[in-house]
Amino acid sequence: MAKRDYYEVLGVSRDAEEREIKKAYKRLAMKFHPDRKSEDKNAEEKFKEAKEAYEILTDAQKRAAYDQYGHAAFEQGGMGGGGFGGGGGGADFSDIFGDVFGDIFGGGRRQQRASRGSDLRYNMDLTLEEAVRGVTKEIRIPTLDECDVCHGSGAKPGSSPVTCPTCHGAGQVQMRQGFFTVQQACPHCHGRGQIIKDPCNKCHGHGRVEKSKTLSVKIPAGVDTGDRIRLSGEGEAGEHGAPSGDLYVQVQVKAHPIFEREGNNLYCEVPINFAMAALGGEIEVPTLDGRVKLKIPAETQTGKMFRMRGKGVKSVRGGSQGDLLCRVVVETPVSLSEKQKQLLRELEESFVGAAGEKNSPRAKSFLDGVKKFFDDLTR
C-alpha cells in the first residue's frame, strides 16, 4: 500500500510551523495510542503513521529532503522502530551528488575522514506524574562502542595503521575512461589513506565493538509527548576514533485515568448527584498535589467548568504554571429504593404546571421551540 502524505497524516499544511506539527501529532497520539484502547481497529497503525510523520517533519534536514523528493528520500534506510532505533533515516543526497560530480570533474573529496558515529533514538514512556514532576531513569541501550583494546584505532596494541600502498595516502586513485580521467575512492583503503596490516584481535580492525550500556537520563519537569532530549556523544562510537553520535530520547506520555493534558492545563470530569447540582454543596477533587475542596453553587448544570488556577503543569521552559479545569457531569441516580422512587415521583408532580416551568427553563424553551416548529409546518 502506498504511503500517505506526511502532511495529510497530521492534518497540517505544507508550510506549517513546528509548533503546529507538534500540536497535531499530540492530538493524534492521544487519540490512537495503544494505551487508550481505541475502538478503531487500525488505531495502532495510525499511531505509528503519525509518529513517523512527526519524526520526519520536525527534523529540518529530513523535512527538506521529504519536501523535495517525497517518500523516495527515505527508501534506503528506515526510521528505526520499537523502543530503540537508529537516529538516521533517509539517503544523504548531498553525498550522492557530491560523489558523482566530484569523481567526473576531479573535484571530489580527497582523503576521507573516518565517519562520525550514528545517532541513536530511544523511545521513553512516562506516566503523567513523571512528566509533570520530572524524573531520573536508567535506560539500557545496545550500541557500537569504542574498542577498549585498540582504543578505536583498529590496530593491534603495539602496532599502528600504515600508509596505503595503492594510493600512497591520498585516499583516491585516478582511472582513465575515454577522454576523461576519473578520481574515485581507493578500493584498497576505502578512501582513508591508511590500512591496518595487523588488526586488533577483539574488534578485527573495525575499532568498534557491539556493547550494551546503561545511562542515567534526567527528564526535566513539564515535558510532554513529542518532546525530545539530546544526550551529546552517547550515540554510536565513530569509526577509528572519530566523534561519537548523539542519543535522542523521545518522550511519550501514557494516558491517565483521571486527567487529560492540553498544553500546560489539565482537564478532568467531576460527577455530582442531581441533588447537589440543584442545592449546591462542597466536594473534594483530585489534583496532582493531593485533594482540594471545590464549592459547587446551587443550580449547577452539566458541562459547567470550574478553573483551579496554578493546579496544572509548569512549563518545561519556565514561566507560569497551568490550571486544572474541572467539568461537572450531573449523574442520573440508579438502583433506587422504593422510598427514593416515591420521593422522586412527588418531586416530579411538583414540577407540573406553570410553577414547574420556572424550575426547568431550558426544557420550557425547548418545548416552545418544538411547538413553533410544528406550527410552522402546518401553516
Swiss-Prot record:
Which organism is this entry from?
A: Yersinia pseudotuberculosis serotype O:1b (strain IP 31758)
SMART domains, sorted: DnaJ
Gene behind this protein: dnaJ
Residues engaged in binding Zn(2+) 1: C147, C150, C200, C203
Family according to the record: Belongs to the DnaJ family.
Cite the entry's keywords alphabetically: Chaperone, Cytoplasm, DNA replication, Metal-binding, Repeat, Stress response, Zinc, Zinc-finger
Alphabetical list of PANTHER family matching this protein: CHAPERONE PROTEIN DNAJ (PTHR43096:SF48), DNAJ HOMOLOG 1, MITOCHONDRIAL-RELATED (PTHR43096)
One Gene Ontology cellular component annotation? cytoplasm
Q: How does it assemble?
A: Homodimer.
Protein residues bound to Zn(2+) 2: C164, C167, C186, C189
Which part of the chain is the J domain?
5-70
- CXXCXGXG motif repeat segments: 147-154, 164-171, 186-193, 200-207
What does the record give under GO molecular function? ATP binding; heat shock protein binding; unfolded protein binding; zinc ion binding
A Pfam family matched in the record = DnaJ_C
Q: What is known of its domains?
A: The J domain is necessary and sufficient to stimulate DnaK ATPase activity. Zinc center 1 plays an important role in the autonomous, DnaK-independent chaperone activity of DnaJ. Zinc center 2 is essential for interaction with DnaK and for DnaJ activity.
Q: Which biological process annotations from GO are given for this protein?
A: chaperone cofactor-dependent protein refolding; DNA replication; protein refolding; response to heat
* Compartment annotation: Cytoplasm
Names of required cofactors? Zn(2+)
Protein name (database record): Chaperone protein DnaJ
On cofactor binding, the record's note says:
Binds 2 Zn(2+) ions per monomer.
